[in-house]
């Protein structure tokens, strides 16, 4: 009897550390087999990301999302909130991985061996897949939030500190999904 032991590896990445508004969203992905076209989500067009996200969801052995809400970001800081969201994504996987690879320089606290890989979203297919899923989900959320909080342009800039967003922030003031701990939101509140 020939038994092959397959090590299950999860890739984890985040989207939304830098924006002035919205949650930080993470994904964890365990792939069954390689998927052509996987790379860092920032190197793909929205159309390419959306098509790959469909394939990842169909072909991955498992995937899950994690998040840290604006209140958690403001309370913990973005670094700790991101690690919390990463842990939530891994813990939400329906299958427990043997190893976890995380994009970046830091790893969340897990009861599984975990390694941080700088630029992992360009190097490790599982991290690339996680990058794509997290980006597509967060972008969809920001488009939906644009309808709830009109005037800020969330559908276009996804909460990042663009000139249009800063101008809207000055004109309208912060809304519920703005990160109070982030400048220029904090600067505006303190005036």
UniProtKB/Swiss-Prot annotation:
One of its GO terms (biological process) is DNA replication, removal of RNA primer. It catalyses: Endonucleolytic cleavage to 5'-phosphomonoester. Manganese or magnesium. Binds 1 divalent metal ion per monomer in the absence of substrate. May bind a second metal ion after substrate binding. Residues 7-191 form the RNase H type-2 domain. Signal peptide: none annotated. One of its GO terms (cellular component) is cytoplasm. Its EC number is 3.1.26.4. A divalent metal cation binds at residues 13-14, 103. PROSITE patterns: RNASE_H_2. One of its GO terms (molecular function) is RNA-DNA hybrid ribonuclease activity. Its cofactor is Mn(2+); Mg(2+). Gene3D superfamilies: Ribonuclease H-like superfamily/Ribonuclease H. CDD domains: RNase_HII_bacteria_HII_like. It holds the Pfam family RNase_HII. It is found in: Cytoplasm. Keywords: Cytoplasm, Endonuclease, Hydrolase, Manganese, Metal-binding, Nuclease. NCBIfam families: PRK00015.1-3 (NF000595), PRK00015.1-4 (NF000596). Belongs to the RNase HII family. Endonuclease that specifically degrades the RNA of RNA-DNA hybrids. This is Ribonuclease HII.
């Amino acid at each position: 009897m020939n038994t092959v032991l397959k090590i299950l590896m999860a890739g984890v990445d985040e989207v939304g550390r830098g924006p002035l508004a919205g949650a930080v969203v993470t994904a964890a992905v365990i792939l069954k087999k390689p998927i052509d076209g996987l790379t860092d989500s920032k190197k793909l067009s929205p159309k390419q990301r959306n098509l790959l996200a469909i394939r990842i969801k169909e072909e991955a052995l498992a995937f899950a999302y994690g998040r840290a809400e604006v209140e958690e970001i403001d309370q913990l800081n973005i670094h700790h909130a991101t690690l919390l969201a990463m842990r939530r994504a891994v813990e939400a996987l329906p299958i427990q991985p043997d190893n976890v690879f995380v994009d970046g320089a830091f790893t969340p606290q897990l009861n599984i061996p975990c390694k941080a890989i700088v630029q992992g979203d360009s190097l490790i297919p599982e991290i690339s897949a996680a990058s794509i899923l997290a980006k597509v989900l967060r972008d969809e959320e920001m488009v939906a939030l644009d309808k709830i909080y009109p005037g800020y342009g969330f559908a276009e800039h996804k909460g990042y500190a663009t000139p249009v967003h800063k101008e809207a922030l000055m004109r309208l003031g912060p809304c519920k999904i703005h990160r109070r701990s982030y400048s220029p939101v904090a600067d505006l509140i303190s005036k």
